[in-house]
Amino acid sequence: MDGLFAPIPSNPLIDFTILLLVTLILPPIFERLKLPGLVGLLFAGIVLGKSGLGVLNEDSESIKLFTDIGKIYLMFVAGLEIDMVDFRRTRNRSLLYGSLTFAVPLLTGLAVGLTFGYSFNASVLLGSLFASHTLLGYPIVQRLGIVRNQAVMVTIGATIFTDIAALLVLAICISIHSGSFSPAGLVVQLVAIAVYSALVLIGFDWAGREYFRRTGDEQSNQFLFVLLAVFLASVGSELINVDKIVGAFLAGLAVNDVLGNSPVKEKVEFLGTTLFIPFFFIGIGLLLDLPAFLVTLTTLFPLVVAIVVGLILSKGVAAILAQWKLGYTWVEGLTMWSLSIPQVAATLAAAVAGYQAVNAAGDRLVSETVLNTIIVLMLITSIVGPLMTAKFAPKIPIPNTLSSLTEDLDDPEENGAVTLIPPKASTFTVLVPTQNPQTLSYLLEMGALIARHESGVVIPLAIAKAPVHMDDPGLTSRLARNELLLQQATELATNLKVDAHPALRIDDDVARAISHTAREKNADLIIMGWSQQTLGLRAKLFGSTIDSVFWSAHCPVAVMRLLSDPRSFHRILFPIKNLTPQTLELFQFTQRLAETNGAIVTLLHVCPHNTSPQQVQAFKTEMERFLNQCRATADYPIKVICHDDAAKVLVRVSHTFDLVVLRSFRRRSVGGVALGEVTDKILREITSSFVLFGDPYA
């Protein structure tokens, strides 16, 4: 239809600007309405497309490019987010559950398609759309501390099998639909897919490791390498007549181990989740014909019900069969079911690929009716799945990680390189950068107290920014100023009866100077000052000094905001989310802080409001065992509060404490210092002193 804004010229710049504006404004509005942000993007696509104002044209080259990149990025991130370490631990069980949660929904979708008169090929593709799933409930189980539960790990691992199998079925169905299918051709196609998959999974993994090893800390080039890998794999898949999303997903799996939890991964995901993936969802809205969509919901309502109910029930049957075969509890089986319900990433990308597959007769493999129904399915399952996870997952007991703690620590490679601070034969060394004179006094005092407790030394570090020429007059003045700072720091340490070994570096990168000096001096701990700018947009886009030190340092890093003399800290709050080896390390650090002043450490755990009294008591018992594992000699009060807003509780409780100890979680962020959502909110609102602790590779 001719839109109201038809006079506006259509060009890539205008299209891109509109897409950015929509991506920025609409998702937060819909989230305030308790709806997923992607619903807002779909709504925007409908309003701006042919069924609304006609501002954006889905057939324009720029829109096609943006949505294609978004689709590729969506599948790449889906492969990148799979935890390969957990998958390797449970691969046999994951294969069993993956086979069940693929086969049962596939057969169900096939039956639904044939019942409603679709061809066998289209019905098989419909079944494959049922088979995959998106782990929208992962943040819930992660918040509850049950990610290490075997049933949850198996469900996560099964995602690899379901997504790969569904994408392979898509490739075959598109080949058949194009008319180029024959038994011999199918064999050739399968061989080509197998060879191509091996080249991507093995070749890209090897190339990535070699490139990252040779480039060291050159994150910009590594970032470009990852982008090249994604799009090269996508182009390669099209060369063998397989949809580009297959290559993107395989590329995500291939570079998964190479990236680990590095800053490069965070920035790659940041680019996709904030820019290109939202464009894909807007593009889906542009494809929707609103009158046809309403017709689907009314005249073809039985098809909608059959697809939605068939998907949910088939996933339930697969979960029950796996629960029975693997010996899990009913609650674990129901949680597996809830996690496998949401249909977003692979499902939607495959549905769009099928919709865009047109044969010589002009027929689409996935009809407009089915595409509309799949969108309804996505909306319903993306809401129902997480709601069910939130209902069933809290009933799963938190895994008893203490029983296997020693085994995990003995194998740091298997456990994500956990590095407890062991007693060393050499002198305990604390490194304190002196970049900010206003915070130097308290930071150095804290470092000296810890070093004195360990009969160690403190290294005040001053860094002069390196100019192009070493005879620059500005460098001379900076060196003089830094030498004065080091002299003051040495006097302060001497007053606290601690040996100080000052160090002065000339470097053009502050973070690199800190991490290199720490390694050269064999430091056991780095203490830095907190900057509120670390939470700003610039830091999230480009990183910060704190972020870089967190990622590059060989030893634990403690970033502190100290509002008073550290010797006055007598009440320390230690929030404890779940019992892991990393928690043990952080608690050991907190013990050190407490013992320097004879402070009392209070352990606080915030659990969901619907947690049963039995579960609360069980967690208290686990924490008591945890303290015994730490060989705690003092009494440590334990608090458990049931509330759904952990950040709000922690901020409120922190008012009565002198110091709060928090951890930097790298996994769940997209840029800057990687913080959990709760930690990020706490740091923005907390009014007391705090320590943000990060250990290498965590």
UniProtKB/Swiss-Prot annotation:
This is Na(+)/H(+) antiporter NhaS5. Keywords: Antiport, Ion transport, Membrane, Sodium, Sodium transport, Transmembrane, Transmembrane helix, Transport. Belongs to the monovalent cation:proton antiporter 2 (CPA2) transporter (TC 2.A.37) family. Disulfide bonds: none annotated. Na(+)/H(+) antiporter. Its main location: membrane. InterPro entries: Cation/H_exchanger_TM (IPR006153), Na+/solute_symporter_sf (IPR038770), UspA (IPR006016). One of its GO terms (biological process) is proton transmembrane transport. It holds the Pfam family Na_H_Exchanger. GO terms for molecular function: antiporter activity. The gene is nhaS5. It is a multi-pass membrane protein. It is found in: Membrane. The chain crosses the membrane at residues 10-30, 35-55, 65-85, 100-120, 121-141, 156-176, 184-204, 222-242, 275-295, 300-320, 333-353, 370-390. It comes from Synechocystis sp. (strain ATCC 27184 / PCC 6803 / Kazusa). GO terms for cellular component: membrane. SUPFAM superfamilies: Adenine nucleotide alpha hydrolases-like. It comes from the Bacteria.
